[in-house]
């Protein structure tokens, strides 16, 4: 939406400029230190210039007049004949036996007798395989009915095995989460036990130090 609104704004902006912008007919030059409104009202002699847009701009040196000749580029463009390109109509049907896919290669190697023999052998193999496939398709139509029931059994067994694997993965994930929670609880209990042992150890040491100090004072 932002892109569409920006494009619409640009189109409206350019259209407004092209409609409202006009080239002035005259440019009036006011003398220095003069009031502009008074100058425009009274008019300054020989201070107005008629504004005209030139068709072309020609640069000439040493105050020499240059005849406005025809541009050489335009003559060159009109003199050069346009060459017509002959395009060959493509065939309606493309077959692999008549046209192999080797023409798609950008850099085609030079044709040699060995390459021609290899292509001929490949073409014969393709035709033979196509005929064998046609024969096999007729035989497979009879077997499809018997194989359909077996395939259904296989799909059901595969579906049940997939469901079992999903259930096993979910149960394993739950067990791993429970084990992680138990490990966290054990670590917290060990930390609290270490703190309690440190407090008890410090209390016992302070008690023995106090008793020894009292005994030495006696």
Swiss-Prot record:
Ranges in the topological domain labelled Cytoplasmic: 1-198
Coiled coil: 167-198
Modification Phosphothreonine occurs at: 89
GO-annotated cellular components: mitochondrial outer membrane; peroxisome; synaptic vesicle
Ranges of the Mitochondrial intermembrane topological domain: 217-218
Membrane spanning residue stretches: 199-216
GO molecular function per UniProt: protein homodimerization activity
Residues modified as Phosphoserine: 129, 131, 146, 171
An annotated GO BP: protein targeting to mitochondrion
Topology class, membrane: Single-pass type IV membrane protein
Key word Transcription present: no
Signal peptide (residue range): none
Compartment annotation: Mitochondrion outer membrane; Peroxisome; Cytoplasmic vesicle, Secretory vesicle, Synaptic vesicle
UniProt xrefs under InterPro entries: Mff-like_dom (IPR039433), Mff/Tango-11 (IPR008518)
Keywords, in A-Z order: Coiled coil, Cytoplasmic vesicle, Membrane, Mitochondrion, Mitochondrion outer membrane, Peroxisome, Phosphoprotein, Synapse, Transmembrane, Transmembrane helix
Statement: the UniProt record of this protein carries the keyword Amino-acid biosynthesis: no
Pfam assignment, any one: Miff
Assembly and binders: Homodimer. Interacts with DNM1L. Interacts with C11orf65/MFI; the interaction inhibits MFF interaction with DNM1L.
Function: Plays a role in mitochondrial and peroxisomal fission. Promotes the recruitment and association of the fission mediator dynamin-related protein 1 (DNM1L) to the mitochondrial surface. May be involved in regulation of synaptic vesicle membrane dynamics by recruitment of DNM1L to clathrin-containing vesicles.
Family the UniProt entry places it in: Belongs to the Tango11 family.
Name the UniProt record assigns to this protein: Mitochondrial fission factor
Species classification: Eukaryota, Metazoa, Chordata, Craniata, Vertebrata
């Amino acid at each position: 939406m932002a892109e569409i609104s920006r494009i619409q704004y640009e189109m409206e902006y350019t259209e407004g400029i092209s409609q409202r912008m006009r080239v002035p007919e005259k440019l009036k030059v006011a003398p220095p230190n003069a009031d502009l409104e008074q100058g425009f009202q009274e008019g300054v002699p020989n201070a107005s210039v008629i504004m005209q847009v030139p068709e072309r701009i020609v640069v000439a040196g040493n105050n020499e007049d240059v005849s406005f000749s025809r541009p050489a580029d335009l003559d060159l463009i009109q003199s050069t004949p346009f060459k017509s390109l002959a395009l060959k109509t493509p065939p309606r049907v493309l077959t692999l036996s008549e046209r192999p896919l080797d023409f798609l290669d950008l850099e085609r190697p030079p044709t040699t007798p060995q390459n021609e023999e290899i292509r001929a052998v490949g073409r014969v193999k393709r035709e033979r395989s196509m005929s064998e496939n046609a024969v096999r398709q007729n035989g497979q139509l009879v077997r499809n009915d018997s194989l359909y029931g077996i395939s259904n059994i296989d799909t059901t067994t595969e579906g049940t095995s997939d469901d079992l694997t999903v259930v096993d993965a979910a149960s394993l994930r739950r067990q791993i989460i429970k084990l992680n929670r138990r490990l966290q609880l054990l670590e917290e209990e060990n930390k609290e036990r270490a703190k309690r042992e440190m407090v008890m150890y410090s209390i016992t040491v302070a008690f023995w130090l106090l008793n020894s100090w009292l005994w030495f004072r006696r």
